[in-house]
Structure formats: C-alpha cells, structure tokens
C-alpha cells in the first residue's frame, strides 16, 4: 500500500506542483523519485510531528496542499493540539496520512503501537 501511495502521489505532484509532501523522518527511500524529480515538493521535517503540522498549516494558508506523512500514533497523539488549533479551528486544508496502524511496528516497541486508531 505504501508503494502505491508513493506512485499515486508522484502522479498528483506532476500535475499539481502546489502539492507538498511533509515527512516526519520516515519513508525517505519510498519517496526517492519525488525527491529527485520534484525536490521543492518534499520536506523532511525530522522527528517533530507537531512542528510538521504547524508548518503544513502555514503552507495551506499560502495556497499549497500539504500532505503530512508519518507513523500513525505520532501523527495523531503527538500532534492533536496542532491539528485542532492550527488546522481545524482555522480551516486550513491539510491532508494527514498515517502508516503503521495497530501493531504494524510491533518490532519497534509499544511507543510505536497505534491500537486506539
């Protein structure tokens, strides 16, 4: 599914250069083709998920369509305040894409589990 997402996103960015993928230090090799062909459309925000959401809302205000991609539990649980206050309350259009729901990242320990999603 991740490979399909990356291929589909590549096609979308090719048609619409206002789409920007923000990653929280995950999936870097998955998006090599995007980084190579559209370097301005990929941003690795590091392990700073709340900052990624705030950055994305700023981009949305400037007519970009940011897509935030990271492990589900970090995307939601670490960033809930920014999602609510920056994106939802201010009606900023951002897209959240979580990967590794449930116990998909079981080998990384309980901090990476997302059993409440």
Label the predicted regions.
Residues 1-117:
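Thiamine diphosphate
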């Amino acid at each position: 599914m991740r490979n399909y997402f990356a291929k589909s996103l590549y096609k979308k960015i090719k048609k619409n250069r206002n789409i920007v993928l923000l990653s929280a230090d995950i999936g870097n090799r998955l998006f090599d083709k995007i980084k190579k062909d559209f370097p301005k459309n990929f941003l690795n925000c590091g392990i700073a998920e709340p900052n990624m959401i705030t950055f994305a809302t700023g981009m949305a205000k400037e007519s970009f369509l940011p897509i935030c991609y990271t492990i589900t539990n970090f995307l939601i649980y670490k960033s809930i305040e920014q999602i609510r206050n920056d994106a939802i309350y201010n009606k900023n259009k951002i897209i959240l894409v979580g990967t590794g729901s449930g116990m998909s990242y079981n080998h990384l320990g309980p901090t990476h589990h997302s059993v409440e999603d």
